[in-house]
Regions:
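N-terminal auxiliary segments of SAM/dcSAM-dependent transferases
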Residues: 2-46
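Class I SAM-dependent methyltransferase SAM/SAH-binding core
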Residues: 97-99, 108-155
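A short acidic, Gly/Pro-enriched loop at the edge of an enzyme's catalytic core
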Residues: 154-166
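A short glycine-rich, Lys/Arg-flanked "PGG" loop and its adjoining helix->strand segment in the class I
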Residues: 178-193
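Short, glycine-/aromatic-enriched active-site segment of Class I SAM-dependent methyltransferases
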Residues: 199-220
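Conserved catalytic loop of SAM-dependent methyltransferase domains
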Residues: 242-263
């Protein structure tokens, strides 16, 4: 009688890679005023930039309240960006479920819930961000529909086909797009919508410029070429329905931020990269087929 040797199970794959661990550690300890003071204006804490024409009159008036006016205007511009992304999520019903992937401190999830009245799951690899965002959901009285979880966007563990829509707002540069879009193709129901707003380097410029490399180093990220988004979407059943170049629309935000107390030292780099054509700020919306 022969016996079969017991099967030795493989070691479980790490939840996140060593690189992602370094990113999580950064965001677990990050307390940058540019990510906090703007959210204090109305309780919607965003981790992205703004779009639209700035109201330059905020630079006028009493000097002692000048910075307060600038911060309020910067927040208005970043809220306009969040609303623009939500505009491209398509028709969302109150009983639909959305995924805010790389949710930061949760502002985008709250925007989507306020707009559609829907269920939103926000995910981040930063336990500090998740705890902060869940506290904000409670303060806004929507924690029955908006929940934040400590998860890896490359391997979420959510059920297949469980989401009507998914978005990334300036977070795709932290992951491999081939892995990311494969996971989203699994998570989205057929006909579901994916939206990203992202910085990418311009393929026609050639390789990443000095400014793009500086931004990578500043944020511990790896900015993808524009072409990579469309290549990996095509490989993973995501068909673009809308592409909007927001590069010109984000420049006023950066010019105004450079005049505020919230400067981080990266403002001139962004402005140079946008203006020399090496860096672009895009919205891409795609349907899952």
């Amino acid at each position: 009688m022969t016996t079969t040797a017991p099967r030795v199970s493989a070691a479980p794959a790490p939840t996140i890679s060593p690189y992602q661990e370094s990113v999580a550690d950064y965001w677990n300890h990050e307390k940058n005023p540019v990510n906090l003071r703007l959210g204090e204006v109305d309780g919607f804490y965003h981790h992205h930039y703004g779009i639209g024409d700035a109201d330059w009159s905020v630079l006028d008036g009493p000097e002692d309240t000048r910075d307060e006016r600038i911060i309020a205007e910067l927040h208005r511009l970043e809220c306009a960006q969040a609303d623009f992304l939500a505009d491209h999520l398509g028709a969302v019903a109150a009983d639909d479920r959305l995924l805010d992937s790389g949710c930061g401190r949760g502002g985008g999830s709250l925007v989507a819930n306020k707009r559609f009245g829907c269920h939103v799951d926000g995910i981040s690899i930063s336990k500090t961000q998740v705890a902060f965002a869940n506290e904000q959901a409670k303060k806004h009285g929507v924690d029955d529909k908006v929940r934040f979880r400590l998860k890896n966007m490359l391997d979420t563990g959510f059920e297949t086909g469980s989401f009507r829509g998914i978005w990334n707002n300036e977070s795709t540069m932290y992951v491999d797009l081939s892995l990311l879009f494969a996971e989203y193709a699994r998570l989205l129901a057929r006909g579901g919508r994916y939206v990203t707003i992202t910085g990418c380097y311009n393929d026609t410029y050639g390789l990443p410029s000095r400014e793009v490399s500086t931004i990578n180093a500043h944020y511990i990220c790896d900015i993808h070429p524009r072409s990579a988004y469309f290549k990996e979407m095509a490989n993973n059943r995501l068909v673009p329905i809308s592409v909007v170049d927001l590069t010109a629309a984000t420049i006023p935000y950066w010019e105004l931020r450079a005049k505020s107390s919230l400067v981080t030292g990266i403002e001139d780099t962004f402005l140079t990269a946008y203006k020399n054509g090496s860096f672009q700020y895009l919205l891409i919306a795609a349907d899952r087929i």
